[in-house]
């Protein structure tokens, strides 16, 4: 068992001789269990690639609005060939969680997209993220302590948190659940 840390991801590897593959595969569920909500993806398919594949398989389109991540989500998803209808980068502005959710509903309707994903600006280590689907809107205010990291690392962390919400929705999981070391401060559903 080994690991490689490259914030925001810690890569876990279980390696050994091919003759012991069955033993390693038997151990892997325990590793997955210990990782819990911190598990982002398994194998070599990145989270943006996984999201893009699932969106294509389910014939869903997505539109994005980014403040803090400044277009990083659009870059990641377009690089993975996601069915991205539109994306916008807005200047930082103070928003309540209800406002983020409301504007996301409007954005989905305006762009005729199946899904809309918004990342607001960061205030006091907290960020609003909203996902609007055909069934409704799930918005969360998350607290994470990442101020010691460079701006681009904090942006990658927030992009990963937003994509995790999408992955959870696509997999039928609780969208507003805790994300490991990230604390859910507030939720809002429309």
Positions of predicted regions on the chain:
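Short alpha-helical segments enriched in small residues
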Residues: 23-190
């Amino acid at each position: 068992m080994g690991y490689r840390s490259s914030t925001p991801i810690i890569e876990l590897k279980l390696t050994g001789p091919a003759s012991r593959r069955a033993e390693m595969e038997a151990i892997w569920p325990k590793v997955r269990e210990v990782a819990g909500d911190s598990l982002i993806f398994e194998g070599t398919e990145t989270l943006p690639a996984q999201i893009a594949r699932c969106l294509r398989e389910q014939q869903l389109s997505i539109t994005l609005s980014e403040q803090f991540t400044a277009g990083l989500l659009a870059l990641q998803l377009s690089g993975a060939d996601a069915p991205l209808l539109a994306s916008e980068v807005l200047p930082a502005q103070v928003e309540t969680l209800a406002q983020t959710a409301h504007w996301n509903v409007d954005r989905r309707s305006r762009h005729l997209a199946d899904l809309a994903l918004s990342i607001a600006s960061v205030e006091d280590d907290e960020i609003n993220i909203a996902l609007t689907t055909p069934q409704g809107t799930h918005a969360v205010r998350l607290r994470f302590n990442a101020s010691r990291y460079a701006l681009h690392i904090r942006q990658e962390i927030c992009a990963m948190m937003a994509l995790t919400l999408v992955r959870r929705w696509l997999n039928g999981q609780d969208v507003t659940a805790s994300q490991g070391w990230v604390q859910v401060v507030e939720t809002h559903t429309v």
